[in-house]
């Protein structure tokens, strides 16, 4: 949703987990019927989608653009699965080697949301990826 030239990492992980359970996952289209729509945005200033255009049973909004304290379900957060197929226009992989931060900057919510820096397991790479974009906030601060 944010349109900042990167795929939404949370949606990629959610899509992979839902597909692994046998659910059909696709981008929502107006006037189509859906049991559930998952929406995620990183920034509060990102305009919201008009969900009234959808025939949907439930809309679940997540990400720091909606709720600073919200978290992905633990099974999704701990999964290495990532569905790059929902973003075919991006020819790269996304990767984090740590989450959290060593600092407590007043303008940033990473430390509040993710805690102190800790190493995380790398996620699956894009099978069609030509390079890796490392989105690690503290790549050089991680002692491991």
Place the predicted regions along the sequence by residue:
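Conserved Radical SAM active-site core
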Residues: 34-36, 46, 93-98, 102, ...
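A cross-domain feature marking catalytic cores of carbohydrate-active enzymes
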Residues: 41, 63, 136
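Alpha-helix initiation/capping motif
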Residues: 8, 45, 83, 121-122
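Catalytic core of nucleotide-activated saccharide and alditol-phosphate transferases
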Residues: 54-114
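A short, structured N-terminal alpha-helical element that caps or precedes a catalytic domain
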Residues: 1-58, 66-67, 141
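Residue-level signal for the start and early helices of compact helical domains
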Residues: 16-18, 88, 92, 130
